[in-house]
């Protein structure tokens, strides 16, 4: 059995952001020092629904990689429908290199309509079929970027 910590950086008490980040670092260090297997960071935008305050799990992962020795670093999740697939694939691969191979990739389609409409109108959750097609295409491109030396893609 493996144990991971879902580090949902909620800010119910409206602390200064630097305080929230420092608390997140303390949790991360605690998990690393006490042999937890992994730590997972979220991606949410606009700090409204649920008060989640982490907008970029890869940046949080880079911070964790620089401060820890063994814990695996995951994203719960990268909302891939919000991002350019090649850029996101590159960023994940770079984090994996910076962390000496400790990355766990977590992906999703998004959950809050307001986030989707503001991050990428093509990811609108009101049209689930379109959102899913975008998700599939984005993931296909990301996999090609990770596994093929050269590739092309013809899509929507």
List where the protein language model places each region.
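N-terminal beta1-alpha1-beta2 module of alpha/beta enzyme domains
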Residues: 1-67, 71-72
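Generic secondary-structure boundary/loop-capping signal
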Residues: 43, 68-70, 77, 148-150, ...
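Short, flexible coil/linker segments at or flanking structured domains
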Residues: 24-27, 61, 76, 91-93, ...
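Structural motif
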Residues: 42, 76, 106-108
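Conserved strand-turn element in the central/C-terminal portion of the radical SAM core barrel
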Residues: 74-82
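A short, hydrophobic/aromatic-rich structural module that often spans a beta strand
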Residues: 51, 56-59, 88-93, 156
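Flexible, glycine-rich active-site loops centered on histidine and acidic residues
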Residues: 2-19, 81-154
